């Protein structure tokens, strides 16, 4: 009879059941995903494996607490313990990135960017960001995104030969169009942006300079990648990806007036109650990034990405910009006559997860694309090094070579077992 009672009327013991018994369908999905992560090679550049401590914080009782407002200035009672977590996250972010101000409440990187726009722009203002096909992000002015609908969005690109940001084009466009805000950063750009020149261009044209370091925040935290924080008026980031925390966003600045405007934009302007369980997990991840070992991790991420890209290039694949300075690489599949979506499917069937990705000058639709993006952060977290990433490169080459040759290439059928064996040697902690 108890299974017919509404949840509120069910015996207290029923609500204490572990997921496996309380909801077998969802438990099976969660366990299947755990098994997939355990036994496959994860090369999606925006993904990583968090620690057990981050999982514990995110799955804690802090999910029960509403806490609109900021520490010490809440609109609900009973917030003294969640205030501890949020204050810790703020202070750790400030220490890690050397800034005066941090807002840790954005639910995502996209909402962090939206909060900056809400704080600093008016509808119809001009913004200037990296073109999506050149490695930019949807929230930097893509027409399908709010940023491309509410603002007059302009874009800059990359040099057609080097595939590096054409800073002269950025300057010409900024001087001609006078944008209110210039954005540096992206989701598939593998080189170090010239943050100092971006700021100089912004200053010369009366623009605000925003750096979106969502992809390389962990590398910045580990001292392996130049920091945009000293140059940007505002820096946004996610807390996952290379920072290896829970999925979420964060906003950093040294400007007190901008900080006040951002606080008001995040709450009450854009969001209501913060996700306190996620903020607690952010604090844990930021604390982990402050440990000496994280610097070695950040350096290893870049070394491994370079090893992977070099092996793919040796095997005949075209790497956009000729290599990488960070955790990701973009592979142009056009010389091999392959589509990104087909490559993504074939690799997933072999136990290797990537994502299809546009390449500079791509004529294919976003659902197809002419490239794939690969990343090293997740498998580096498992303990893999350059030798393993060269092996991964060999597996990718075998799959894509077989796809190019109509499935006839020798060795392709052996890839799933080899990928599973490599994963088995570097298990996850959960």
Swiss-Prot record:
Keyword Transferase on entry: yes
GO molecular function, one term: pyridoxal phosphate binding
Metabolic or biological pathway: One-carbon metabolism; tetrahydrofolate interconversion; Amino-acid biosynthesis; glycine biosynthesis; glycine from L-serine: step 1/1
Subcellular location: Cytoplasm
Annotated site, Plays an important role in substrate specificity, chain positions: 240
Coiled coil: none
Any one of the GO CC terms: cytosol
Family annotation (Pfam families): SHMT
Record-level GO BP terms: glycine biosynthetic process from serine; tetrahydrofolate interconversion
Cofactor(s) recorded in Swiss-Prot or TrEMBL: pyridoxal 5'-phosphate
Family membership noted in the UniProt record: Belongs to the SHMT family.
NCBIfam families: PRK00011.1
Subunit structure: Homodimer.
Function: Catalyzes the reversible interconversion of serine and glycine with tetrahydrofolate (THF) serving as the one-carbon carrier. This reaction serves as the major source of one-carbon groups required for the biosynthesis of purines, thymidylate, methionine, and other important biomolecules. Also exhibits THF-independent aldolase activity toward beta-hydroxyamino acids, producing glycine and aldehydes, via a retro-aldol mechanism.
HAMAP family per record: SHMT
Protein name: Serine hydroxymethyltransferase 1
Species per Swiss-Prot/TrEMBL record: Bordetella parapertussis (strain 12822 / ATCC BAA-587 / NCTC 13253)
Taxonomic lineage: Bacteria, Pseudomonadati, Pseudomonadota, Betaproteobacteria, Burkholderiales
